[in-house]
Regions:
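Core domains of carbohydrate- and sulfate-ester-processing enzymes
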Residues: 43-71, 153-160
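Short aromatic-cysteine micro-motif
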Residues: 16-38, 62-115, 120-132
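Sec-dependent N-terminal signal peptides
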Residues: 3-13
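Short beta->alpha transition motifs characteristic of CBS
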Residues: 140-146
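Phosphate/oxyanion-binding loops and surfaces in catalytic or ligand/nucleic-acid-binding neighborhoods
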Residues: 37-42, 141
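N-terminal secretion targeting segments of exported proteins
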Residues: 1-2, 175
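Disulfide-stabilized, aromatic/cysteine-rich ligand-recognition loop
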Residues: 15-18, 26-34, 61, 79-88, ...
Length: 191
């Protein structure tokens, strides 16, 4: 008697489609909720100072500058993008919120479909997160992968066509993982 062996190959296909992400700027209020919930101390708070950009070319070190008082004097407004945060701070927020930072490439892929006003040409003050395109409002920290340097995306209110060209995708600006500034914030990937 012959035995017939039937081999059945089953190909499993994923039932879910690739994630459809959006990008969203983290506001002062959202960051405050994180701080209140965790007691986290930011890099700027730890150091007791941070950089405050005065214009596209000049900055100064200001004691007491942090996410609550980005210029060291005035209290942050809840609807504005959180600033004076470092990559380390952004990562801790992401862990708490269960979200991720975009890579530089993903950032530009997602912001290209936002048709709201791009802030540039030295528009001051920083605009509310809901009223403008995130490009050009504050620099956004992106996920650097294995690099020790963090590439900033999007440009800031200090950028213009005559200066840093920050709102152009091919612009390269890097900071270390502990640097904050009055015009550096972060955006997250959302589903």
């Amino acid at each position: 008697m012959k035995k017939i062996v039937l081999i059945l190959f089953i190909t499993l296909a994923s039932c879910s489609s690739p994630k459809d992400y959006n990008i969203k700027t983290v506001s002062v209020k959202e960051f405050r909720d994180f701080i209140n919930d965790t007691g986290y101390i930011t890099s700027a708070e730890e150091y007791g100072w941070s950089f405050v950009q005065e214009n596209v070319y000049d900055y100064k070190v200001v004691n007491g500058a942090n996410w609550m008082k980005p210029d060291g004097i005035n209290v942050s407004i809840d609807s504005l993008p959180v600033t004076q945060v470092s990559y380390k701070d952004a990562i801790e927020y992401c862990k708490w919120a269960g979200v991720e930072l975009p890579t530089y490439e993903k950032y530009w892929e997602l912001v290209s479909s936002d048709d709201r006003l791009i802030v540039s040409n030295n528009m001051y003050p920083i605009s509310s997160v809901k009223s403008v395109n995130i490009v050009g409002n504050v620099w956004d920290i992106t996920e650097p992968g294995n690099s020790d340097q963090v590439r900033l995306a999007g440009g800031s209110l200090f950028c213009s066509i005559d200066t840093c060209h920050g709102t152009q995708e091919d612009r390269e600006l890097y900071v270390d993982k502990e640097t904050g500034n009055i015009h550096i914030g972060f955006s997250i990937l959302t589903e």
